[in-house]
Amino acid sequence: MKFSLSTSFAKRTLFTLLAVILLTAGGRMVALQAAGVDCAAWPLCLPGSLTGAAQLIHRLSAGFASLLMLALLFHAWRAQRDHRLLLPLTTVTVTLFFAQAFVGALLVTRNFPLDLQVMHALTALAVWVSLAVLTVSAGFYARDVVAFPPLDVRQRLKDFLTLTKPVIVGLLLVTTFAGMVAGAKAWPSFSLAFWTLLGGALAAGGSGAINQYIDRDLDKNMQRTAKRPLAAGRMTPAEGLSFGLGLSIVSFYIMAGYVNLLAAFLSLAGIIYYVVLYSMLLKKATVQNIVIGGGAGAIPPLVGWAAVTGSLSLPALILFLIIFMWTPPHFWALAIVRRKDYEKAGVPMLPVVRGEAETRKQVLIYTVELVAVTFLLPLIGYTGAVYLFSAILLGGILLYYAWRVYKNAGNKVAWMMYRYSSMYLMFLFLALMVDALV
């Protein structure tokens, strides 16, 4: 395989790399001279000294580099949209570059706190590494513009939305916001709630898109998922992966910049848990995939709690445990209904490996344990009568459905259990919020 920078994409990449080298060198000089304090307005200023002028020139250079980055991103999504290395790598590089600019803006407006200085430096290093790797990769793999079929913009937007699994995102945001209200014992400020929920939505959507990239071949064999954008071939795998990576990176920096670092790293942990531990390692490897993998969906209330308190405590861990215990009976009920799909796709779900009778038994056992866990919050004195009454009522109905699943074979009662368990979790966390506010 011959290295060449003759393609237009490779040339753009090299030119962008050189511009970033100059930008970084200028930024280093500005940092050594502490020029930021002489150009404190953002994005432009009227410098009163040579050091302030140097800072202004650095920002203008960053603006020029930003245009180059946007052009590179556009070119990649036009000419390399089916390349599983170049398109994701370009998307990550450009996203990190703008994340660095975002952190740089926060540095100036927040008087250069140490944590943002460290984040700015580490992000700059990540941009350097990814751009260097992209330049070398473009020399080996880039090609000139290929004629792809025209795109239906409306269908395209619909497919991007589908990649994020919006229904799941909505449920996760309910538990995130409930964690905020329960942690603060009050209604959070609009700005904090907005940034936390936006960051959470992007994190959940990004991990959902990456999950669909990983499962694209599996999804083709399942009736429930065969029409997803990647499985159906309406989008290339590279596009799905790139979109997911971009959303995930943006989510981290939004959390870190506008919420706090603990919430940001918890959100990042949720992405890694879902993508790596569950999607890549557990889903096709063990019958315990749902049990262990359930921790990914249990992280959002921790993120919400950390957003308002800056810490974690026992009630937050109980919220995590509630969702962790809720996940197996919820998804095993679905697995009973979709057993043939999972069997065809080779996914070792409990009904496939141990049979429907054992699965129905485990649904009941885990439901009993789940309902018991929900009473831990009033037991430690953290919640009051509203939550306790709701936990009893909702839990009683859930136990009724679980008992019916245990006693009756077939899809009908399992589907009813699956549908109600979704509403159960939502209403339980809504009750938690009401209890915290009264």
Locations of regions flagged by a protein language model:
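Polytopic transmembrane helical bundles with strong interfacial aromatic enrichment
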Residues: 1-160, 169, 187-189, 201, ...
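Cytosolic, membrane-interface loops and tails of multi-pass inner-membrane proteins
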Residues: 37-48, 146-155, 214-235, 332-360
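Core segments of transmembrane alpha-helices
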Residues: 61-70, 169-173, 244-250, 293-301, ...
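Interfacial loop-to-transmembrane junctions
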Residues: 118, 236, 399-427
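Small-residue-rich segments of transmembrane alpha-helices in multi-pass membrane proteins
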Residues: 128, 173-177, 228-229, 291-308, ...
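Helix-coil boundary and interhelical linker segments in multi-pass alpha-helical membrane proteins
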Residues: 178-198, 250-265, 301-323, 375-387, ...
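Multi-pass membrane catalytic core of lipid/isoprenoid biosynthesis enzymes
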Residues: 224-265, 356-379
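Intramembrane alpha-helical segments
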Residues: 237, 241-307
